[in-house]
From Swiss-Prot:
Pfam families: Ribosomal_L29. GO terms for molecular function: structural constituent of ribosome. The gene is rpmC. One of its GO terms (biological process) is translation. It comes from Microcystis aeruginosa (strain NIES-843 / IAM M-2473). This is Large ribosomal subunit protein uL29. Belongs to the universal ribosomal protein uL29 family. HAMAP family: Ribosomal_uL29 (MF_00374).
Length: 72
C-alpha cells in the first residue's frame, strides 16, 4: 500500500481537513492502545497515519498563512 498523496488533501475543503485531522489523531491513539496491549498486527499503519496527519496539518497551516498574509 502506497503512502497517501498530498494532492488528495489539497482538494479537500477546510471542514473536511479539520475532520480528517481529528480522525487521524483518533486512529493514532487507537493504534498506540493496540500496540500497548499487543494486539497490533499492521504496524505499517503507524507510518501511514503519521504521514497523513503531517500532510493534513501542513495544508491546514498553508491555508491559514495564505489567509492572514495581506496581498501586496
Amino acid at each position: 500500500m502506497a503512502l497517501p498523496k498530498i494532492a488528495e488533501v489539497r482538494k479537500m475543503s477546510d471542514e473536511e481537513i479539520a475532520a480528517a485531522i481529528l480522525a487521524a489523531k483518533k486512529k493514532l491513539f487507537e493504534l498506540r492502545l493496540q500496540q500497548a496491549t499487543r494486539r497490533l498486527e499492521k504496524t505499517h499503519e503507524f507510518k501511514h497515519t503519521r504521514h497523513r496527519l503531517g500532510q493534513l496539518l501542513t495544508v491546514e497551516r498553508e491555508r491559514q498563512l495564505a489567509q492572514s498574509t495581506p496581498e501586496a
